[in-house]
Amino acid sequence: MKLALITDTHWGVRNDSITFLDYFTKFYREVFFPYLDKHGIDTVVHLGDIVDRRKFINYVTLNRFKDEWIFELEKRGIDFHVIVGNHDVPYRNTNEINAMKELFSTIDASEKMSYYYEPKTVNFDGCDILLMPWINNANYKDSIQAMNDSPAQVCFGHFEIEGFEMMRGVKNDHGLKTDIFSQFDTVYSGHFHHKSTRGNITYLGSPYEMTWSDYNDPRGFHIFDTDTRELEFIQNPYRMFHKVVYNDEGKAVEEYKKMDFEMYRDTYVKVIVQNKTNPYAFDLFLDNLYKSDPINVSIVDDNKHLDKQPDEEIFSEAEDTMTILSKYVSNMEFQGDSAKLNVLLRDLYQEAVHLEL
């Protein structure tokens, strides 16, 4: 049996941006559901954070969520299992009140949809899989006990595990220890949007780009085979963020007249100016770029020739925002718990980068 695994869909991201809803819809209409149809996949498991806002949902977002996700699952007769993530709950100390419970209980197709705010071992065609929702202070002991008691060798969850990258180049320095998952052959998790693997634990990553931190970081969904235990990655070809290097040295103006800018429509574009020797050519380039109707264009003069460095080198040489904040906290003189302050700052930062101003 093959299961489609998807996680961190964050319906309503960037302050319920219509542009991002359109971007999400394109992925579902042209990539996700066509793949399920072609391969006859009738079971989908969502590993948490199906919505973005913790305390409410915008009516426009809800309408699009139902039309492009729920009803598409329903008309295909797909069995849908969703694990509650931290963005699906309004409170930090309980999962009992959650978006899935409130939304799915009012939908006629709810008999084909199962949501899990408590741990549960589910059998998928002979393969036991432990489904683990977000772990908080109140359910920590019960969650650990459920992991120890489950006969499953495979675990799907929404975990915050120490040592994994939250986004590319930004490592999480707190959370669950990896050794508590040692009894499982395989653990697949949502929560961190960067796709990564260490040992028996794999973060699946989000299906699409939502911030500049996601730039050039592969996004998509996965297919898990319950018989072979193999995982296949299906990449999303559509991107929201682009970097364009401008260098008109040795180029004729005619080249800029022939350039195709259509791929930048409804996306964010960062133009890195390496060499600008012909002002007319540069203006022509920008005019044609703006005619493609991007959401936003930012222009950066490249004094350090960043285009000649791999992205990995740029990330390693530059301190990310969270590292700067963490160092600031460590140098402060105060009586409080610095670890808790770091967590608070990280949460505030994550909220900020997901807002559409």
Where are these regions (language model features)?
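Extreme N-terminal starter segment of soluble prokaryotic enzymes
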Residues: 1-4
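Divalent metal-coordination and catalytic microenvironments
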Residues: 8, 28, 44, 49, ...
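Core catalytic region of metal-dependent phosphoesterases/phosphodiesterases
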Residues: 9, 13-120, 180-184
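Active-site environment of divalent metal-dependent phosphoester hydrolases
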Residues: 10-14, 52-55, 82-94, 122, ...
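Short, conserved loop/helix-junction motifs that constitute active-site signature segments
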Residues: 73-76, 146-149, 178-183, 262-264, ...
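Conserved catalytic scaffold of divalent metal-dependent phosphoesterases
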Residues: 88-179
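Conserved beta-sheet core of the metallophosphoesterase superfamily
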Residues: 167-233
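Accessory, non-catalytic peripheral segments of nucleic-acid enzymes
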Residues: 226-357
